Amino acid sequence: VSKIIKNLEKGNGGKKEAFVIGLIDRLPIKSATLINAVTGHALDYDDTHFGSLGHTSSIVISAALAVSDKKKSNAKVFKEGVLVGIETAIRIGIWLGRKHYHQGFHITSTAGIFGSTVAAAHILGLSKKKTMNAIGIASASSSGIKAQFGSMVKPLQVGFAATRGVESAFMAEKGIKADTNIFDKLDGYGTTYSAEFKDCAFVNLGKKYFINDVKFKFHACCHGTHSVIESLIYLIDNYQLKDSLINRIEVFINPQYLKICNIEKPKNGIEIKFSFKMIIALLVNKFNTTRLDTFSDANCHNKKLLKTCNKVKIIADDKILETESEVMVILKDGRTIRKKYDISDKLKFSTLEKKLFFKSKSLLGKRISKKLWYDNFFDNSLPSNWLEKNLQ
């Protein structure tokens, strides 16, 4: 999907304003924002805040990067924009609540548009009044549905949220005014979008930061599958598991994931990212789930993987938290082994570093991954300059 969008936007032409991942030439701000956001979410590495159930980084960082290029902002202003944007998206996501999500909205994009708007507004140096107008403008474009999970449209929704947020900030800068009381008013955003109106989302503004609770992804698939992945990796590593030793696998998950990442028979690589059974089969058969090529169309028809899938049973359990799961493996020799894992548990920094570096190395290689980790590129230069120098 990112290749299609990239080719479409390149064909549109326009000013060479902003950095695009994978392109030598720059593109107009809106094009760059769209491509980078779609690419970031399609890769499925973007992190999650489980309080809001949203992925904020692809939307906000893409918007902030493009606007920074337009304004020639240094890395300090860029970083501030990213932080306030992500914090905004998280807090609005929490305010919307589970009701909004279970109604069918893709909260990453519905709440995320406000993150991209605020990030862009900060980098543009908008006043409080104009920032409020930008948020009001953005509310008219907030969209995204969970029905698109497993399709190319899911990352597109993220791209739309990033782009519309940037547009909203520029419109407000030029003087477009909106109703700024859009969240709580009768027939406003909250009631229209099935919000829970959770005021706890706005407690301790400027004192407590929800961004500190963002959890990183270590695998290139839906974050709802990651506690299962970590549980199974533990069992594979500690019991030398392989398919020939396994009689069956039972996986206990929070019921909400039956509708999110439990595609029984994925038809393409994107759907594999939302399939407990196929991801388990990949791990048992020694595939690396940090690699993008693991989630290929061809693997949907891999006979070894399909054989392993038939051994897996997914069981919904109300006692299992949203961030945890339990994997039980019944071996052919009669033994039963199990592991429970909660991805909300805080990791040691050394463990976090190891996992992030392994993921990055799978995508970018060892040399660039080391530069990303050790380079001090948050100096006074334009953020995209470092990216162009090291990633293109």
Where are these regions (language model features)?
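Alpha-helical support elements that line or immediately flank enzyme active sites
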Residues: 56-77, 112-126, 222-240, 361-368
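Short, glycine/charge-rich beta-strand/loop segments that flank catalytic centers
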Residues: 6, 55, 80-83
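Glycine-rich, mobile lid/loop segments that gate access to catalytic sites or pores
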Residues: 69-167, 181, 185-188
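Terminal-appendage/accessory-domain detector
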Residues: 1-53, 150-163, 170-392
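Function-dense linear segments that define catalytic or interfacial modules
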Residues: 34-48, 52-73, 88
